[in-house]
Design a protein with these regions (language model features):
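Electrostatic, structured charged patches in enzyme active sites and in nucleic-acid/phosphate-binding
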Residues: 1-118
Length: 118
């Protein structure tokens, strides 16, 4: 989940399942886009979909995908270290409720893997 007008480094990538160039703002988003592109059940991918009318501000969902069976899924990419922050939790909850109101219940969070020191 990102602000609608992020002020950070942006990777622009074209993939066959997206109608426009995807703007990616983290390695996690970039890696997950690769996974979505390779997933056979995904028909189309939209990146940074605006959450218009959200009460907490102007934000976007990272990925909205249409599946080949006609259903939709939404994924939010969040670094694991931010999951315990109250603002992150609030924004993720707002996103989940936003999409649920629009009939999309397949909503999930994508996180990075924890690295363990041995």
């Amino acid at each position: 989940m990102m602000r609608k007008d992020p002020k950070c480094k942006c990777e622009k990538r074209a993939v066959t399942k997206a109608n426009s160039v995807c703007r990616l703002y983290s390695r996690l988003q970039s890696a997950y886009l690769d996974i979505l592109q390779k997933t056979d059940s995904i028909e189309t991918i939209q990146c940074n979909v605006p959450l218009d009318g959200l009460s907490v501000g102007a934000y976007t969902s990272d990925f909205l995908c249409k599946c080949k069976d006609g259903s939709f899924l939404v994924r939010e990419c969040v670094e694991r270290k931010f999951l315990a922050k109250p603002m992150t939790v609030s924004l993720l909850d707002a996103s989940r409720k936003f999409w649920k109101k629009r009939g999309i219940s397949n909503w999930g969070i994508v996180t990075n893997q924890e690295k363990t020191d041995v």
